[in-house]
A protein has these predicted regions:
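Active-site loop/oxyanion-hole signature of alpha/beta-hydrolase fold enzymes
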Residues: 25, 58, 65-106, 267-270
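Gly/Ala-rich beta-loop-alpha elbow adjacent to hydrolase catalytic centers
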Residues: 107, 111, 115
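Conserved alpha/beta-hydrolase catalytic His-Asp/Glu region
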Residues: 145, 159-216
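Short beta-strand/loop motif that positions the catalytic acidic residue
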Residues: 215, 221-223
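Acidic catalytic loop of the alpha/beta-hydrolase fold
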Residues: 225-230
Length: 276
């Protein structure tokens, strides 16, 4: 299957000054919410958030659902380092190209780390942050000690992922694997076949805990106590260091709060966004 034929909606494309071409969905009108997905094989903005952003459209928000470089319909260069600075620069470039002056960043896992990184780099751009089990608050070795990360990297490096292998990876993301329809697995398998091997081997995200005090914007966070990818102890890293943060911690919940507790997630986010 060619990238043109991926089972994902086609939205808009922007080419950055670097030549990198990024894909994004632009849905709704109003204050801007930027959706930043995580780093799982085959991920895209749509596959991560298709159960969430429609409620934000209905509530009067403009939603920029981005495919990060290396994912979805965006470019997937095989000759670069997929480190945090690269991702932050790419998202910043896209927002500048779209003349976004102010926005809320909403990020899951790697996307949460990017949201923190961009919030530190360009604080004037950020109105609020919504973080779901964000990366960037532990050392790399801590994340790679988690069974979810270990198995994900092992299966990705072993060769092309099929539906069964993708189901194994994605089941580790959730407490209740019944939330995994075959259509979602098929979307991710199709994207994963185009992803370069350097994507995960060069993915370096620093521990930003000591800089969280610089984030002077309201933060709403979510974390599942059964997270197999990012340790739930990260909650206290954010609460102890960021000046204005609150978290919803859920038991019987894995790495994908927005999927396993969709209604609670959508409602809580919208209440947070609509607060003065």
């Amino acid at each position: 299957m060619s990238e043109q034929d991926l089972p994902l909606p086609i939205g808009h494309f922007v080419t950055l000054d670097s030549g990198l071409r990024l894909h994004y969905l632009d849905e709704g009108s109003g204050p801007v919410v930027v959706w930043l997905h995580g780093s799982g094989p085959g991920a895209s903005g749509y596959s991560n958030f298709k159960g969430n952003y429609p409620d934000f459209i209905a509530a009067g928000f403009r939603n920029l659902v981005i495919d990060l470089p290396g994912f979805g319909r965006s470019d997937k260069p095989d000759n670069i380092n997929y480190d945090l600075d690269f991702f932050v620069s790419a998202v910043s470039g896209l927002l500048k190209a779209l003349d976004v002056q102010r926005c809320t960043l909403l990020g899951n896992s790697l996307g949460g780390a990017i949201a923190i990184g961009l919030g530190l780099a360009e604080p004037q751009l950020i109105e609020k942050l919504i973080l779901m089990a964000p990366g960037g608050v532990e050392e790399r070795a801590t994340y790679f000690a988690k069974i979810g990360i270990q198995r994900m990297v092992e299966l990705f490096n072993a060769g092309p992922l099929d539906i069964d292998k993708m189901r194994e990876i994605m089941s580790l993301q959730l407490f209740d694997a019944s939330h995994l329809p075959d259509s979602l697995l098929a979307e991710r398998v199709a994207v994963a076949r185009h992803q370069p091997h350097c994507l995960f081997s060069t993915m370096m995200v620093p521990n930003m805990t000591e800089r969280l005090e610089e984030l002077r914007v309201p933060i709403l966070g979510f974390w599942g106590t059964n997270d197999n990818f990012n340790p739930v102890g990260g909650v206290m890293k954010v609460l102890d260091n960021a000046p204005d943060a609150r978290f919803i911690v859920l038991n019987r919940c894995g790495h994908w709060v927005q999927v396993e507790h969709r209604e609670l997630f959508n409602r809580s986010c919208l209440e947070f966004l609509l607060q003065a």
